[in-house]
A protein has these predicted regions:
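Export/targeting segments at the very N-terminus of extracytoplasmic proteins
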Residues: 2-37, 85, 89-108
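Long, amphipathic alpha-helical surface segments
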Residues: 3-17, 30, 41, 68, ...
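Second-shell loop/turn segments in exported
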Residues: 16-22, 72-86, 102-107, 135-140, ...
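Surface-exposed patches in mature extracellular/periplasmic domains of secreted proteins
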Residues: 43-48, 100-114, 152, 186-191
Length: 197
């Protein structure tokens, strides 16, 4: 799931997400809309994401799902928008519960901050945070420092081992939501591996 160029439609402009402020709306509905837009909206038919290097990613459907009911999406997979929205809500709830259970500080974050972290985990998987090798991100979230969290999230912009502009754009948009600012002009600060997180 990336925000790189979708083969079947044009790429979204990052400033389109400026209007989202999860504090002003119901958390679940706004988080669903935020993620849906980052994923290119609802897609009834399976599609493949075109990576920056021209290769095609996995088959995807709905709101950026590569798996439905534990099975990989194929060109024959079907889904309704109602089904897709329910899967998206279930996934958001699962991610939210995971962070509440494993990172107590998460419960003290603002709705915008939670929405940004959920979007990140929806895109990368919660395992990116949990594996021991990713100590910078894990410690940043466990510590609750906003700058360390967004900088650590910003390290995850590769697809297939190569930098992906769509993922860089997505991390930028998530960072701006986390900081409750617009999506323009934010640049990640690189974190050295030996930084004491």
């Amino acid at each position: 799931m990336t925000t790189s160029q979708i083969v079947t439609s044009s790429e979204k402009n990052p400033t389109e997400y400026d209007r989202y402020n999860i504090d002003d709306y119901g958390w679940m509905d706004t988080t669903k809309q935020f993620i849906s837009n980052l994923e290119g909206g609802f897609r009834e038919k399976p599609y493949r994401v075109k990576n920056d290097d021209g290769t095609l990613g996995n088959w995807t459907i709905g709101h950026g799902f590569e798996y439905i009911n534990g099975q990989p999406v194929t060109p024959q997979t079907t889904i309704t928008e109602e089904q897709s929205l329910q899967i998206l809500e279930d996934k958001i709830t699962e991610i939210d519960s995971h962070f509440l259970e494993n990172y107590p500080i998460y419960g003290d974050l603002s709705p915008n901050q939670k929405g940004a972290i959920v979007s990140f985990a929806f895109n990368t998987g919660t395992n990116v945070v949990d594996v021991p090798e990713n100590r910078i991100l894990r410690k940043a979230i466990a510590g609750g420092d906003p700058n360390k969290i967004i900088n650590a999230m910003g390290l995850y912009f590769n697809s297939g081992g190569k930098p992906n502009q769509g993922l860089k754009n997505r991390r930028n948009i998530e960072a701006q939501l986390f900081l409750n600012n617009n999506a323009n002009g934010f640049t990640y600060q690189q974190i050295p591996e030996d930084d004491n997180y």
